[in-house]
């Protein structure tokens, strides 16, 4: 049996779909469907069962899944970087992750979990080492803290954490303001022909802030590779290894539609000091572990994503 937490979310649902494509339907999907629109992410997927995240945790603690689970892909978390309820974040992200790790350690179950590039905060280097980790918000701190916990353990199972950089692609529409800029630029262009980007900040020209934009399909491939290589443990960056600008994303959206323009808007005061103007994954450790697949560029993946979006109809549209 395979468990995917956050299964109705962005990366989790893409992972479930990819497992289906590999012929695996023996999947327990774990999530919180308070936002019922997330069910659309699983509507075309095959699963064995669905469990609410709290119910699943209770059954894990009670030992009801002992010896029954092959791997847990732990993608579930509150991923809002603007959420400042620290008590909620610690319970939902940190303590929950610890409980699942303790289960996997006890039952020798593989544990592959979502960390985040946000742990690097304002760092200018993105290498998996302690002196470069400077979280700027409580979400990032919750992820950082669990990575620290993992480092101090000596579990009897595979434990692999992936520090996701700026992931974009199908099945992210439920994320609202936290969805990718590719998603928002596409919506803006369809609405009024204009992609709105922030003006320059931190010494960057307008729209030239740089991020490591990584396509969700590639993120899923790394997760599956780790599952298939159970001897690999550790915390790894998961990005393309090549930063691209917000202008690059906007231009890819405009090129796909064959129309549109860019407008630069003032940088919000509330984000100053809590914003990463540059991220670029250092993939040295992931490559050294044996991962050889290439990652799609913005120019390659954005058209693929927008073609998928054009086939979808979402609630509220």
Curated annotation (Swiss-Prot):
Pathway listed: Nucleotide-sugar biosynthesis; ADP-L-glycero-beta-D-manno-heptose biosynthesis; ADP-L-glycero-beta-D-manno-heptose from D-glycero-beta-D-manno-heptose 7-phosphate: step 4/4
Annotated GO MF terms: ADP-glyceromanno-heptose 6-epimerase activity; NADP binding
Catalytic activity: ADP-D-glycero-beta-D-manno-heptose = ADP-L-glycero-beta-D-manno-heptose
Keyword field contains ATP-binding: no
Cofactors required: NADP(+)
Comment, domains: Contains a large N-terminal NADP-binding domain, and a smaller C-terminal substrate-binding domain.
Name of the protein in its database record: ADP-L-glycero-D-manno-heptose-6-epimerase
Species of provenance: Shewanella piezotolerans (strain WP3 / JCM 13877)
């Amino acid at each position: 049996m395979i468990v995917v937490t956050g299964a109705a979310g962005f990366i989790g649902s893409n992972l479930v779909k990819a497992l289906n494509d590999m012929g695996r339907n023996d999947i327990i999907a774990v999530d919180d469907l308070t936002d019922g629109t997330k069910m659309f992410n699983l509507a075309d997927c095959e699963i064995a069962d669905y469990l609410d995240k709290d119910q699943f945790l209770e059954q894990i603690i009670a030992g009801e899944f002992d010896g029954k689970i092959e791997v847990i892909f732990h993608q579930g978390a509150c991923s809002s970087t603007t959420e400042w309820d620290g008590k909620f974040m610690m319970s939902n992200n940190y303590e929950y992750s610890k409980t699942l790790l303790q289960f996997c350690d006890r039952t020798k179950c593989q544990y592959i979990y979502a960390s985040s590039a946000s742990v690097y905060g304002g760092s200018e280097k993105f290498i998996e080492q302690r002196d470069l980790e400077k979280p700027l918000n409580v979400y990032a701190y919750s992820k950082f803290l669990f990575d620290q916990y993992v480092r101090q353990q000596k579990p009897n199972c595979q434990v692999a954490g992936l520090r996701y950089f700026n992931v974009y692609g199908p099945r992210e529409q439920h994320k609202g303001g936290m969805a990718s800029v590719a998603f928002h630029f596409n919506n803006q262009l369809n609405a009024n022909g204009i992609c709105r980007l922030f003006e320059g900040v931190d010494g960057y020209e307008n729209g030239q802030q740089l991020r490591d934009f990584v396509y969700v399909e590639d993120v899923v491939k790394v997760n599956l590779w780790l599952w298939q290589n159970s001897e690999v443990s550790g915390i790894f960056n998961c990005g393309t290894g090549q930063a691209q600008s917000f202008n690059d994303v906007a231009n890819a959206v405009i090129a796909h539609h064959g129309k549109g323009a860019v407008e630069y808007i003032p940088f919000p005061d509330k984000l100053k000091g809590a914003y990463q103007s540059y991220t670029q994954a250092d993939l040295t450790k992931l490559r050294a572990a044996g991962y050889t697949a290439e990652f799609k560029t913005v120019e390659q993946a954005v058209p693929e994503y927008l073609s998928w979006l054009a086939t979808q109809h979402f609630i509220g549209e």
